[in-house]
């Protein structure tokens, strides 16, 4: 039950202020008992704590940040606005409600039925120095998780607690989002 003072290892659930949280602590070696930061069993952990969407949010975008010698970790973004604000300058967001954007996200709705839309592309520098435009986010930078901490990596539409439908491509790239009227 955790109050015996024994070191915890592997996956474990810890009760903090009446709420249960899932953790992963290293099992062996010099880091035995240390909280894992990174991926384990298709889920991500920050300082041992499972990165998952809150029950009210249902789905949340997670940003991986790695600033040399300063910060490294996974940060949940509160909502679609925070997600767009966190995108680096190499990303582009088209928010025009037009048929091309509905098609880009695979939405079979009438334009009048869409209240808000965002289609995400990014510039990627090729080895020869040319710039290629790719659809969606880099999965090493941004990914979508559900309330159990599972990374959404299949082609799907996932509605968060604010009625934003996040569109994810096979492989986990976030292509954008939309809100229906």
Model-based region annotation:
Residues 1-181:
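Extracellular adhesion/carbohydrate-binding repeat motifs centered on closely spaced tryptophans
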